[in-house]
Amino acid sequence: MILFIPYLICLVGTSSALKVMTFNIWLSGAEVTNGMEKIAKQIQNVNPDVVALQEVESPDVVTNLTLLLGDNWSGVHHCNSTYPDTGILTKHTIIPGTYVHVDYGMHVKIQLLDTKRQISFWSMHLDYRSYGPYACYNKLVNSEKQIMAGEMPTTCTGRVQNMVQLVTNQNFINQISKSNVVPVIVAGDFNVPSDEDWTEANRAEHGGWAFEWPATKILRDSSGMKDSFRELHPDPLADPGITWSTVNKFEKEWDYTIPEPEDRIDFIFYRGPLRPTSSFPYAGTGPLTPIPHQWGNEWPSDHYAFITEFQDLPVSDDPVDPVKSVDRKYINRHGRDALRVATPQCNAEIIDGSEERQGRSLSLSGEGQHGSEVK
Ligand SMILES: *[C@@H]1O[C@H](CO)[C@@H](O)[C@H](O)[C@H]1NC(C)=O
Ligand SMILES: *[C@@H]1O[C@H](CO)[C@@H](O)[C@H](O)[C@H]1NC(C)=O
Ligand SMILES: *[C@@H]1O[C@H](CO)[C@@H](O)[C@H](O)[C@H]1NC(C)=O
């Protein structure tokens, strides 16, 4: 019996903290002066372990950020080189051959230095069009069907289809089934509020609507993921956690007289044996001067970033509930099309600042192509 005690202490000793940041970098810093430097500086101030990026405008954005962040940082972006949009930065080790993408996001597995732990990490940026809160504040909108038409359009892919594509992705399903050993984190800009936020209690603050926004609901119901912020702060009235917007306070048309609705649209979801200990929106420490006078702001984005700190607990042997099928009401004709992952296969590179200085970058093997993740 006594012999077991040092072993237990040893197990406890392997647990460590994990700080995750999701950061929409607003056209890659183009809307403030020296935007790229400011993005890097804000990441350094937060000092996260992993960052989910959105609005990576071109492939050299991740290269430049890793160069600015310093030696131990590396990154990957979505392999769509026309507009990568999503990317991941970390000061730990990106595991080659683990890149996977969907149309609106991408994933790599990360080995946490100084531990035996790995995480499966997704950065997502769902479609920005037909922004739901605008419908809710439009007095000509009087049925939920009209709002849902924006989330789940029949003529193109919307946020419902984007999320259904993620939760039905075979790699994602495999990751969830192993999340008791390798936690899964889905972070990003969903461009839509949470189904846990627009409740009866705060109807008055939401244009008179309580509404079950579907993207977060699909993620929670189907994959059993939890929203780290809402878990720690369950009352949306007391803790709205607004992330939109830092500087977009009034619409440019009508001479900035019409206010922009404020919402929490950036999220850090997780599944696995780790426990969030703090979670908060973040926009630096300086003043946030609204559009159109934002150019001198130290904070380079029109979103707040979101940060969640996890306590990384020992591996669990508990069985994992598998991913459940998506509620049929979220599948329309265009949704079925989205289930067949449309994006062609492509290669992604791990971009390492120190290697890049010498004019080359580490290439992922063919295993990194879509649909062939090592299980
Ligand atoms: C990245 O850095 C290179 C070299 O300084 C520069 O030419 C390029 O414009 C930068 N790209 C972005 C997106 O800032
Ligand atoms: C970078 O990583 C090396 C090797 O893991 C470590 O010795 C060093 O302290 C790290 N540097 C920084 C700035 O974190
Ligand atoms: C890459 O992204 C652009 C812009 O979103 C899109 O139009 C294009 O279809 C994408 N390319 C591929 C190969 O998916």
Where are these regions (language model features)?
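Cleavable N-terminal signal peptides of Sec/SRP-targeted secreted and luminal proteins
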Residues: M1-A17
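Active-site regions of metal-assisted phosphoester/phosphodiester hydrolases
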Residues: S16-Q42, I88-G335
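Internal alpha/beta domain cores that form substrate/cofactor-binding pockets in large enzymes
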Residues: L18-E31, V61-V76
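Proline-aspartate-enriched helix->loop->beta-strand connector
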Residues: I43, N47-L53
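A short beta-strand-loop structural module common to alpha/beta enzyme folds
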Residues: A52-E55, F229
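Acidic helix-start/capping segments at beta-turn-to-alpha-helix junctions
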Residues: V56-V61, P84, F190-P193
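A short, structured active-site edge motif that brings together acidic residues
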Residues: W73-G87
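Long, low-complexity intrinsically disordered regions of secretory-pathway proteins
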Residues: K329-K375
